[in-house]
Swiss-Prot record:
It is found in: Cytoplasm. The record marks 181, 242 as: Transition state stabilizer. ATP binds at residues 15, 209-213, 283-285, 331-335. This is Acetate kinase. It comes from Corynebacterium glutamicum (strain R). The gene is ackA.
Amino acid sequence: MALALVLNSGSSSIKFQLVNPENSAIDEPYVSGLVEQIGEPNGRIVLKVEGEKYTLETPIADHSEGLNLAFDLMDQHNCGPSQLEITAVGHRVVHGGILFSAPELITDEIVEMIRDLIPLAPLHNPANVDGIDVARKILPDVPHVAVFDTGFFHSLPPAAALYAINKDVAAEHGIRRYGFHGTSHEFVSKRVVEILEKPTEEINTITFHLGNGASMAAVQGGRAVDTSMGMTPLAGLVMGTRSGDIDPGIVFHLSRTAGMSIDEIDNLLNKKSGVKGLSGVNDFRELREMIDNNDQDAWSAYNIYIHQLRRYLGSYMVALGRVDTIVFTAGVGENAQFVREDALAGLEMYGIEIDPERNALPNDGPRLISTDASQVKVFVIPTNEELAIARYAVKFA
């Protein structure tokens, strides 16, 4: 069985999957796992093989040791690189800047180009590079492929991609809208076309990727024409811990009146804002319980969250001119029926009508949740970024 190894390297963790690229979107990966608490004494590796779960607790010094230990654990359970045919390795890379519009076969030169983009993604790209370096040493004889979160949004028209600031400053410092979650938005927008069995160029779609991080995209005939995240993943929708769109003047105000440093404001907006900053929680199951108990902070957080979804929805309906499908995906988008219902409430005049019974069904693969009379077909489609990355990677094998 030919498999692709998919790696998602974070600052203190590595998520990995062994994926059969021929799988359907809802098939479980053959192997999945997580290396966590890298650099800490309480490191842990969790491995899941065809439904069975195995755990190794040990200090993990760095990404190299973490990935080697993960492979050793896989070998112990007959699913490691020495027993299986790994044909390619796909690496999720958060930021490709303006340099990368499509997946790239990784070479030393490509690694240096990704490293040069670290100023655009200082929280993500360094860890992505670490994962690439380690994996190339451990598996030197298979192609390694970088798949960029930003790649899908290279098609944005200038009016959507550029900010109204001094053009020379913007050009010098790479300031523009890049967009993120691109692999997910592309995956579900392609999937809905397959479900409808229509030519890609005939379908206009609005995609909601709603997880702890959240973004939306307007996709016209298979090409992204707008998206809610910007130069960084901080922009756009209200998220679990991120503020989303705010008046930029707030940054100056906090600096001048509260004496906060840039790093403190960065931490506030990225980690202490959003739904959690407003309500104290960022898990929508907890938020729903609080709302049911009439917690006013939870109500306020939820209303602000929904308001921002609807603002972007209206904007993208205008940008597309004609909307054929709407797709919800990711943790909240796939599982929180009340979010879907409230995001699309009262839009029957625009041809959008949710079927309450369909919307209430459990998350079990792609499904239609709009009424038969709805002009706009609304779907819940589970995203599978790892499968998408695996399929890209094996093309280079």
